């Protein structure tokens, strides 16, 4: 009997024992910084001369690790191993697969602060953001294990006295998992374990800037008893290894989280039926957003300002759910804007390894350059009232930036920035605010701050996003509580952490027996 699911609690760092435990986690990670990590194919650890070099984005001189890089030849070897392993893994008991997830979750829980410390070093996450990432990884494993137990016997369908009918789920085959750098543990672990607990085998290609946490997760899966060949670790270039695996005729599905442009490229390539391919590939994609917090004139204005600042600048705005636009009723615009500026100027941007740091660096030089280019655009399209500066001398640090008085059709209101920049736009009324919020090709998250019940219900129906929140920020979905995924160019609305997510990794089979 499995206990009911509830999410992993976040760590309270005001408790001295928790603070000391996290500091021990940092010391442990610092003791093995700079290590080399191999590919893992069929349980075999393979070291290559070509490496992916992972550095600390808060200190470019600090080497986090060097991870062997797969070639096309090694990717092909991994595919053959995964394809062969699938023939036995697909017949494994769902209960056994779920138990592996539960054991893996328990291992991570014991090493929680160590994994969070890796995220501090490799992803530049402050303590609270790193802790939440690790908690979410645990949540995915606990939740998907339980979901598989619910689905293992299929779903009841009608039978008649003369026949017995069953509706069952069977796994798809080999899945290619292409995970992101912004939640390099939680999303990577969630995508991987959803695929394997459903009976599929996996080729895991983690993000090139954060491969070490994925390599450490492979150790967890092995310790949890996952058979060799079920998950194969193949970091590599997207243009070489990624494209090759997406195109491969034995690939049955691709699960991707990342940018719009790469997601579209994967969707296009996966749609092509290549020689030897006997199925249509399935694509599960989450591709980003241009997320809006709408503030009504009948609202808690302090809550509004705090929600905007927290959602815009948590993890330096590098969440696909981050608030990139604040659309505010003209009657309360100045009040909310001024308060948000005050709160933003209180934020500390520093080394995320130091407790109390609000914001660390952005991911890498490319991210720094892109965000700073949008800061320059902001100077032309509005008024910068906070931030606007960046410093990439030691790490990739950008000050939290508020751009006021931005027109609703400006670039800052349309294009995904993926950094600590939020545009403020004035709305004439609530209908106008919703129209501005919906005026984007994305549809991932949004929030409405209002005390007007009619406006809440109107937004529930007309605000076209996959995750909509009322009287809170637009980030922080919790597995099993707020299934996550968006509309339009935000992806396939796959709803990670939801009750129908595992079904995307399986296919339904009907059997009918005449009695």
Curated annotation (Swiss-Prot):
InterPro entries from the UniProt entry: Ald_DH/histidinol_DH, Ald_DH_C, Ald_DH_CS_CYS, Ald_DH_CS_GLU, Ald_DH_N, Aldehyde_DH_dom, Proline_metab_enzyme, RocA
GO cellular component, one term: cytoplasmic side of plasma membrane
Active-site feature positions: 286, 320
Catalytic activity: L-glutamate 5-semialdehyde + NAD(+) + H2O = L-glutamate + NADH + 2 H(+)
Pathway involvement of the protein, from the record: Amino-acid degradation; L-proline degradation into L-glutamate; L-glutamate from L-proline: step 2/2
Sorted UniProt keywords: NAD, Oxidoreductase
GO MF annotation terms: 1-pyrroline-5-carboxylate dehydrogenase activity
E.C. number(s) listed in UniProt: 1.2.1.88
GO BP, sorted A to Z: glutamate biosynthetic process; proline catabolic process to glutamate
Keyword Thylakoid in annotation: no
Family affiliation: Belongs to the aldehyde dehydrogenase family. RocA subfamily.
Record-given protein name: 1-pyrroline-5-carboxylate dehydrogenase
Gene name of this polypeptide: rocA
């Amino acid at each position: 009997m499995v206990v009911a699911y509830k999410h992993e609690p976040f760590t309270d760092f005001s408790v001295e024992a928790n603070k000391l435990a996290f500091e021990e986690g940092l010391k442990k990670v610092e003791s093995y910084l700079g290590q080399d990590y191999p590919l893992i194919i069929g349980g075999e650890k393979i070291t290559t001369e070509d490496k992916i070099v992972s550095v600390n984005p808060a200190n470019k001189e600090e080497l986090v690790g060097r991870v062997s890089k797969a070639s096309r030849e090694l990717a092909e070897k991994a595919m053959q191993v995964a394809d062969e392993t699938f023939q036995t893994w697909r017949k494994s008991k769902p209960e056994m697969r779920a138990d592996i997830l539960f054991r893996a979750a328990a291992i991570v829980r014991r090493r929680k602060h160590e994994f969070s410390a890796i995220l501090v070093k490799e992803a530049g996450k402050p303590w609270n953001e790193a802790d939440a990432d690790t908690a979410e990884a645990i949540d995915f494993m606990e939740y998907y294990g339980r979901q598989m137990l619910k689905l293992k016997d299929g779903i009841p369908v009608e039978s008649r006295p003369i026949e017995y009918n069953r509706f069952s789920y069977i796994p798809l085959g080999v899945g290619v998992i292409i995970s992101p750098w912004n939640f390099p543990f939680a999303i990577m672990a969630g995508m991987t374990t959803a695929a394997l607990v459903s009976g599929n085998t996996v080729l895991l290609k983690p993000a090139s800037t954060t491969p070490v946490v994925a390599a450490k997760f492979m150790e967890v899966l092995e310790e949890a008893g996952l058979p060799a060949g079920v998950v194969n670790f193949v970091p590599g270039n997207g243009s070489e290894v990624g494209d090759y695996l997406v195109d491969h005729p034995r690939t049955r599905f691709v699960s991707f989280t990342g940018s719009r442009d790469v997601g579209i490229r994967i969707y296009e390539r996966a749609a092509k039926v290549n020689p030897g391919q006997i199925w249509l590939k399935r694509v599960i994609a989450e591709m980003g957003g241009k997320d809006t917090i709408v503030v009504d004139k009948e609202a808690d204005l302090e809550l509004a300002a705090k929600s905007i600042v927290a959602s815009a600048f948590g993890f330096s705005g590098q969440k696909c759910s981050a608030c990139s636009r604040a659309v505010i009723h003209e009657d309360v615009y100045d009040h909310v804007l001024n308060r948000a500026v005050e709160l933003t100027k209180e934020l500390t941007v520093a080394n995320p390894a130091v407790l109390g740091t609000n914001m660390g660096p952005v991911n890498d030089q490319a991210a720094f350059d892109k965000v700073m280019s949008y800061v320059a655009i902001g100077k032309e399209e509005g008024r910068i009232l906070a931030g606007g500066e960046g410093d990439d001398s030691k790490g990739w640090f950008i000050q939290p930036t508020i751009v006021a008085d931005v027109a609703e059709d400006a670039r800052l209101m349309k294009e995904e920035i993926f950094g600590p920049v939020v545009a403020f736009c004035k709305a004439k009324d609530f209908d106008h605010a919703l129209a501005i919020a919906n005026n984007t090709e994305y549809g991932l998250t949004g929030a409405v701050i209002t005390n007007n019940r009619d406006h809440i219900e109107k937004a529930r129906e007309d605000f076209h996003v996959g995750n909509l929140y009322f009287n809170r920020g637009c980030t922080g979905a919790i597995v099993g509580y707020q299934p996550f995924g968006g509309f339009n160019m935000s992806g396939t609305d796959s709803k990670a952490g939801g009750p129908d997510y595992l079904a995307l990794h399986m296919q339904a089979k009907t059997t009918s027996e005449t009695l």
